Amino acid sequence: QHHYDASINKWLKNKDGQPEYLTGKLYAQHFKVFVDSMQKAATEIGKKIYIGATLVESPSQGWQTNTVKTWNGMLPELGDKHDFYVVHNYFTTYNANSNAAEVINAAHTVPATMMDFILQTLQTAGAPVKPIALTEWNMWANGSKQQVSNTSGIFAVLVMAKALKNKYGMAARWDLLNGWSNGDDHGLFSDGNEPGIPKWTPRPSFYYMYFFQKMLGDRFIPASVKNSDAIIPYASSYSSGQINVTLINTSKSAVTTEIKFNNFNIGNRFYWYSLEGSNDNGEFSRKVLVNGAGPTLEAGGPAGYAILKSYS
């Protein structure tokens, strides 16, 4: 029995090294076999499925393995077997105690940089352009409770808006539930180990994502800002005729803003929600106030967010 366990342990250690031997080309060869099998199985039960192939989303770095550096060499072998491309990105510098400005700047700039790199990679390889699914995104920033903060909520809205603007087919935040780890926690909800916070309590990012989606129209439309580097605007229109604008203040101070509309008729009334952090934990408040309403706990947001009336 002891010898059996040792053999299993040795086998597992060998398995740990497998990614070093996998190449992009071999992945593509396996991928095509997998797609054929899955498509055949789906057809047999009268279903249509869509399968994505994984790309490396950014230029190679010196510290990366040769597998990662050469991964996108899979494209010629892949051909046209896939329905979309899959990428992941955690935006900020790995394992760094990033400040709020660094976190927000990453959300503001990385989606466009990443899309440019992907499209150039496809063009260079002569590969077909297909939808890009950002199936995992979040931040590496840690050490100051960045991941569970109000700033993480602003980061989330920026990532989603930039994903829309840069025509990603999908942008899925990682993840719903994780582990507290003193605030280095990607979870959208508390896992129950956060002191004084019950399991499934929404984090600030949840509220930002909820209200961004609630107010978002059917079509993304152009928006620009003059005389301010602090405000980032995103606008959308509804098929019913109304329009929406999301204004993100990236500075530490309040900013007075005037909104002007082009090519749209202005209605008689407008409605809005205002989200902001509280005065706890410096740049990374664990609380979010929505139209002045906040949590009764040490973290999170207002319990009645779904029935909270807008300002008007």
Residue ranges of model-derived segments:
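Acidic, Ser/Thr/Pro-rich beta/coil linker or hinge segments at domain junctions
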Residues: 264-311
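Aromatic/acidic polysaccharide-binding cleft in carbohydrate-active enzymes
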Residues: 134-241
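Carbohydrate-binding surface patches
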Residues: 228-268, 272-279, 312
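Generic recognition of flexible, low-complexity loop/linker segments
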Residues: 72-74, 120-122, 158-161, 170, ...
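Noncatalytic carbohydrate-binding groove/subsite architecture in carbohydrate-active enzymes
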Residues: 7, 12, 20-159, 166
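Active-site-proximal beta-strand/loop segments in catalytic clefts of secreted hydrolases
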Residues: 1, 54-58, 87-91, 135-138, ...
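Short conserved micro-motifs at the rims of enzyme active sites and ligand-binding pockets
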Residues: 145, 256-259, 282-289
